[in-house]
């Protein structure tokens, strides 16, 4: 049985491939666009059966000529995740139409389809629950994800031929994101800031939040891969699910966890947030004008629906997840 993973050389996709490998599954077709060549490193430690260029894959899907038999599932992680990309034509073709074509093909072939949605569909809302009236995306990236989620809702009412699951990822961090540049997680950037300069920067006050007090639902990519595989194991489950921890933690906590993990590797003692700020190991910079009115200052996944679907595993909190990630970066990127 073959499994297809799109975006397989990317951040979340490569972690799903790795998680499948840990189960002994290697009959995997990895689909990606390696024009950004350094992404190959994410697959170098993985076992796959074949690599297929994204554009060739799309052509074969649209023409119904994919040569693989007995496809067990498609994990669709290939998309543009740059929330600052305002090219609507590109975003809608890459995120919406590509996903729609894959959905149609999977439904025709009765293949389970698990895809990446995003918490960006909620915009600046304060309630993050999988309900239409709570969804007001702020940018074309969020809209592209939102629009496809509406397609799934309609298809579910009409009746599905095979499982379809959309995961609304919250703030994901962890190994294999180094190719993402400015779109990599704050933890990734703080690790390199601290290693280079001996301190990290956070946004100052904005939108009623104090220095570094903006909060997000930070979720480890290890947990994201686990949830994907849980639904792979339960093909009777379909729908749209938030994928976060259900906790909202301050950027201050994230920065402190990163700095203290780096300090621990240097044999230095843990410091409190107050001490880190006083010693200027955490510094605050003015909030950028370009982000005002477009920035989610608070996110917290309502994971009631995920729990009701039977997923019982605990999620890493910021400290434990960041500790694991920093150790990985020290071993692989430093």
Curated annotation (Swiss-Prot):
Species assigned in the record: Neisseria meningitidis serogroup C / serotype 2a (strain ATCC 700532 / DSM 15464 / FAM18)
Sequence positions that bind substrate: 171, 182, 189, 203-206, 216, 295
EC code: 5.1.3.20
GO molecular function: ADP-glyceromanno-heptose 6-epimerase activity; NADP binding
Described purpose of this protein according to its UniProt entry: Catalyzes the interconversion between ADP-D-glycero-beta-D-manno-heptose and ADP-L-glycero-beta-D-manno-heptose via an epimerization at carbon 6 of the heptose.
Pathway where it operates: Nucleotide-sugar biosynthesis; ADP-L-glycero-beta-D-manno-heptose biosynthesis; ADP-L-glycero-beta-D-manno-heptose from D-glycero-beta-D-manno-heptose 7-phosphate: step 4/4
SUPFAM superfamilies registered for this protein in UniProt: NAD(P)-binding Rossmann-fold domains
Alphabetically ordered keywords of this record: Carbohydrate metabolism, Isomerase, NADP
GO biological process: ADP-L-glycero-beta-D-manno-heptose biosynthetic process; carbohydrate metabolic process
Gene: hldD
UniProt catalytic activity: ADP-D-glycero-beta-D-manno-heptose = ADP-L-glycero-beta-D-manno-heptose
Essential cofactor(s): NADP(+)
Co-factor note (free text): Binds 1 NADP(+) per subunit.
Keyword DNA-binding: no
Assembly mode: Homopentamer.
Enzyme class: isomerase
UniProt feature coiled coil, ranges: none
List of catalytic residues: 141 (proton acceptor), 180 (proton acceptor)
Paired cysteines (S-S): none
Domain of life: Bacteria
Domain comment, as recorded: Contains a large N-terminal NADP-binding domain, and a smaller C-terminal substrate-binding domain.
Protein's name according to its UniProt entry: ADP-L-glycero-D-manno-heptose-6-epimerase
InterPro entries to which the protein is assigned, alphabetical: Epimerase_deHydtase (IPR001509), Heptose_epim (IPR011912), NAD(P)-bd_dom_sf (IPR036291)
